[in-house]
Amino acid sequence: MSCLTYAQAEELTEATSNNVLPTIKLEAQGNWLEDTNAEKVQKHAGARTIITRNRLDEVAATSIKDALKQVPGVQVQENNGTGGSDVSLNIGVRGLASRLSPRSTVLLDGVPLSFAPYGQPQLSLAPVSLGNIESVDVVRGAGSVRFGPQNVGGIINFTTRAIPQEFAGNVSLTTEYASGTDQVKYSPNLFVGGTLDNGLGLALLYSGTKGDGYREANNKTDIDDVMLKTAYQITDADAIALNLHHYEGYGEMPEGLTAEKYAQNPYQSNKSRNYFSGRRSDVSFRYTHQDEKNNFELLTYYIDSFRTSDLETDVSTTTSRMDTSPRDYKVFAIEPRWSRAYQLGNSNSEFTIGYRYLDEDSSEFSGRSSTYALNAPVTEIKARTTSEGGTKAHAIYVDNRFDLGNWVITPGLRFESIETHNNFTAYNQGVAVNTVSPKIDSDEFLPSLSVMYKATDNWNIFANAGVSFGPQQYNQLARLEGGIAQSTTDGLHPEKSNNYEIGTKYLGNGLNAELTAFYLDFKKELILERDAQNNGIWTDLGATSHKGLEVGLAYDFAYLTDALEGLKLYSNYTFTKAVAEAGDFKDKDLPFYSRHAANVGLGYKVNQWSVNADMFAQSKQHSPGSGDTYQTDESADGKLGDIPGYSTFAVRTAYDFGEQFYGLKIAGGVKNVFDKQYFTRSTDSTGGKYVG
């Protein structure tokens, strides 16, 4: 059960509430991710969805995962394995791997969320909290020119709450209660800000998560996420903004269960020492200039992040061992971009050129104890591997939007030049054995072309094609094999994918609808597997293909008749077929995605009351392993075998007391009305079955 209480001094109005497209004028659009609204989505010649704060309130989202389930093509995995806490984020787009979200460019106000965008793009630490978010913008197609490098899974940008013109503030508290284990989790949120007469704007944002999940033990979460936003309007055309952001997260990680233990009690957890923690501090500065024809932006940022984990593994029925993995990362980048609108004959067009320089450093340690008796004190941790890596990357991109009557044609080209190195050392009981120093240089041209036909003021048809690129990460340059450090640059390679879309969108008369067919073609894709010593080993999965259909729909019934004012429908459905095109598993489904996923909901608001009901469903998934046989039957350790599909129902009601009670609102709901029990699996070092 989930309930929400908060007091609010001022409500921010949703920019798209009227669903009206303004008159087109000659003006440079500039940053695609700035001031996102329904109009920008409609003009984008690719699959794109924006979830606003109002929509998040309507669907009673209590987490980033809940928010992303509203987006067609996006599948969210429940907490599991080493991504088994609320500190991490596991999302997969169009059948791509979801563990720690490795194949999408995920941003917060345009700044990368991952530890290191090139060398360590995973989100085992996902420094973003729902309470600080104004909107979620998911660009699934036609975005690879502007953003990278990991963009085959699209671009996901979380926009934080804007600095208001007038002083405003609110506080809120969300409480989640797990009926199966009587566990309680709290999420306090604070927002206060305004703009002074001299044009200086300030805002303080805080969002936290405290308490326990739904497992019986070892699932405590403690998250603090704070941001100070400043902005100053220098002139009518020039503005600067400075954001300071700090995130700290601690999450205990219940282990995966064997099939036998899961049958006994799926909520049990017997590994009290497993946890993940991390912190991130980042600062970003942005200068913008916008006049009648020009839009210039300079963004620079610095990120300092740290993460560590302790993972206990049973070696036998009587002994265990401990693995620990502290890691440090530092990132600096500068990104100038200039757009200019111009007329070509009777048509409006826009040229954009942008550049990014990014420098990142990583320092990683992996240690392991000797074996010890179950529940005995942990023995001394000794080094197994160390890694000192770094990347210097230059990216330049150009695109040009040609408005030719009802046609909009945008060719573009991105060039990535990347130098990555990693000094990787193997140890035996803390004594250095050998060091390898692999390096890889990548120079990649990534072309794209998008075409849109404006059939009416409200309806358009689009198609696009582009090339996406994923550079080799630090842990893909070297590995531990037989106790020896070995370079893998001869056996592995960067990933490339050819991406295609065709679709249509409609916005107007209360209806917001999108339909997209997609196809992703990997010549070679990499996959993370485990060896007998539980080391993570990157190998070639080979050629894969991802194809499918996405549907999104939202409708305001007030446009039908006044009698239905306040009634709204929202839904999405995705069909995905992601299969191997080579190897022993040719034509078989890739691991951990559902061919079918759907979400449908109704919201009704009358006077001060609002009621929402929604259903989420997904079809079965597979965890086939990496042997010679595609395994569908459950293994004894719970890691392998099919995962049944499931559906859940949720209801929520809320009451707005109005301004006479200082904007107080109270809401309550049930997320899983029929108490449906479902599970997922994990194949990593703490793998097994995980109850949902």
Predicted regions and their residues:
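Surface-exposed extracellular loop regions of Gram-negative outer-membrane beta-barrel proteins
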Residues: 248-252, 256-264, 359-369, 373-375, ...
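Short acidic/polar hinge/loop motifs at secondary-structure boundaries
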Residues: 111-140
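Extracytoplasmic beta-strand/coil segments of soluble accessory domains associated
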Residues: 33, 40, 65, 69-112
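Conserved C-terminal beta-signal and adjacent last beta-strands/turns
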Residues: 8, 99, 193-195, 327, ...
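Membrane-embedded beta-barrel scaffold of Gram-negative outer-membrane proteins
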Residues: 173, 190, 286-313, 454, ...
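Gram-negative outer-membrane beta-barrel transporters
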Residues: 172, 338-341, 345-346, 351, ...
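Face-selective signature of the C-terminal outer-membrane beta-barrel domain
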Residues: 233, 239-245, 277-427, 514, ...
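Transmembrane beta-barrel wall of Gram-negative outer-membrane proteins
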Residues: 182-254, 275-286, 340, 394
